[in-house]
Amino acid sequence: MKIQKTECAGETFLSLASPSGLTLVLTPLGAGIREVLYHGVPMTLSPATDADYLHDHVFFYGKTIGPIAGRIDRGRFPGLESEFALPVNPKTGVTLHSESLDYAFHRFGFKIEEKEDGTRVVFSSVIPACLEYPATLEVEVSYFLSETEPAFTLSYFARPNRVAPIHLTNHVYWNLGGKDEAKEATLQILADRVVSYDERLLPKEKVSVEGSPLDLREGKKVEDVADCFDATPLGGIDHGFYVNERSLAHPTYFLTSGDFVLSIATTAKAFQVYSYNFPVEGSRFSSGVTNAKRIAVTSEPVLDSTTMKEDFLFSPAHPFHTETLFRFATKKE
């Protein structure tokens, strides 16, 4: 494993290059993924420069989202309304990705563990309680890059000092091959159910994918599916898909674009998939891809956002923990 450290604007970037051909570039800021390359070809949609990556406050490219990822009505939690009250967007009355508390710009400590079968980078921090979120969290985000296979595992662990709502995920955007044609990618998700949303984009209930554009069990072109929701407030795909199997041994998410294939397996309940519906004018990317709708998709491992109280609450004896395995290949492999 070849490991390199570089600096930009006082921030550290760690590049791990596996003999398998997979390279993972990480940063302690947001315990995030700066870039993923396979045989030197970009697999992610990443800002053109390190400085752009560090200062982006819109898309959170590859960074950790927490303490609560997703949309929450008025920032309140059932049963804990008087204690936990996250910042709210005054225009919508909704909390998105914890707003100003978001971990995407928290600086984590890190250590590198080199082993025979691969290298692990562990980002960790004790994040103190505050008025809006009165719980202290011990957070650990780890990436394990295999020495022999083009794959890496992302693990999230968070232990609160009291009962608290927790929901951590990663906001990486996939653009396999770094081409404009990525919107032609085929997406397959082995999920029988998906989340429906209200006019404020808050999750309502689980519904069957049967007979809907969101039935991706056999695979469909991303653009074709996203265009079905273009006239809605979602603007495209922005849905939680409940996977049929929660296991690292059984991938449930498959993205194919050009010569490349990404398969993902997770212990989380669902994937939140977003088809880059609202590009920001002037955005530039390291791969040179054109800034346009549908050029990338996310695959955020998430919890059950329709039953927030039961699934979001964790404790010292019952910490938050998810694992997700990302594996890359070419069609020839």
Give short role names for the model-derived ranges.
Residues 1-333:
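An exposed, glycine/acidic-rich loop-and-rim segment of catalytic or binding clefts
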